[in-house]
């Protein structure tokens, strides 16, 4: 039988429609037959009981607001009839709960790219990174040129990363740009990187080179467009050298403990808090139990299982 609704927590007094439910639909929830008084769109809530004005609406086991007016069992509960409980200042003390993961450790591996500095990438790409937004045009041309020459084979991707920064930046703003670009240049998913500068920007290529610290000079090349006669030809020459290196990289077995996964916020629809988020939470629990790392971006209104950061 098709599941048409989901009651997330035993304490909830609303349920979520998994598919659009028509008015008059009869559903049995916890042994009680409920008749919907109106159509309830997929992902939206309907009342499991009669609500008095001001009574809390419980979802995920916690109040998500209160009823603006009296509502009947089977009514569609939405932003028009639910009012937030938030008002004024809220006193809050962070009291973390210690949770033990009952997940056995397994000697698992994944196929990754071991870099010279010991870092591990899950992809092997050629990146073109500008020190300043003024060279965005040429880096896009270079990326397209290398894709045409290679047919996109030999590496996972050939990527240009244009941005609008690096020129006339000062202070912390300038330092933050440098830090972000440095982390990109040294990222283990980049098998080779061409850093392209103009020559007159605040983020001077020579200074940025020193800012990088130690790096593999066979895998990171620099080009300053004002110092070359033909920036396209010079850029392609450097990219061919970089591509030659990166295209010979091979995946090797890497302990799962070295895997780092970043979780990105999704569409934030009516289902993400009850489908994707819990699944990613369980995956993160497992990964962390193996010694790996999971970094999560979540909304308070879309809870997952406990997430841990190693």
Residue ranges, per PLM feature:
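Extended boundary segments
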Residues: 1-37
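Active-site glycine- and acidic-residue-rich loops that bind
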Residues: 272-278
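Glycine-rich phosphate/diphosphate-binding loops and the adjacent beta-loop-alpha structural elements
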Residues: 124, 264-271
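Short, glycine/charged-enriched hinge/interface segments at domain edges or termini
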Residues: 56-58, 63-127, 141
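Alpha/propeptide regions of enzymes that mature by internal proteolysis
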Residues: 14, 20-22, 41-44, 50-66, ...
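Single conserved hydrophobic/aromatic residue that forms the stacking wall/gate
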Residues: 298-310
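Phosphate-binding glycine-rich loops and their immediate beta-loop-alpha structural context
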Residues: 105-156, 161, 168, 284
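Mobile "lid/hinge" segments at catalytic clefts and subdomain interfaces of large enzymes
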Residues: 288-296
